[in-house]
Amino acid sequence: SAEVCRRDMRGEAITGMRSSLCLLGALLGRCGQVVMEHPGGCVIGVRPIDLHLKALSRMGVRFTEEAGKLKASAESLHGADISLPIPSVGATENIMLAAVMAQGDTRITGAAMEPEVTELAGYLKRCGARIEGAGTDRIVIHGGKTLYGADYRICSDRIVAGTYLFACIGAGGNVFLEDAPSAQMGTPLKVAEQMGGKLCVAEEGIYVQ
């Protein structure tokens, strides 16, 4: 992907998936400019993106509206001290993706601590980034480093595993959740047992009865 630098995102690719918003930080770091539709794909109601915009603005990004699209530009991204009023996973990830390409250090206070943030940090570090504190509410990203490609195996999805877990309990029968991240599923496993499920947590996954 070394040559990828598309500044104008296709509308259908953006409006169909909420997480497309994370392209904002990544492409600003790569291209310096992005034009994109407002993200969609979420059926739980209107979800604002102000946390993302305010955080990136502190890093030197300018935002305007152009024909209903969001236009972002940054002559030079720079590090900043950013305090998130709520621990948004998406905003934390967007800041990290922009910060690894920015000049100087970025400090996030009130960062999200979910496994998804830790996994992103792990991948970026494998690519040469310097990131400290992922998994806590304070993350420091040392920008300006040269990044390179890398192979990285992400952890299995705890939400998908939990969905199958409770589907099994509701429908009955036996299910083996291969590679389920049990270490990230403490509360769902406890609730499943309270509902009458019989669980066996093993290294290779979770057996559900």
Task: Tell what function each PLM region has.
Residues 1-209:
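Short, structured segments at the rim of ligand-binding sites
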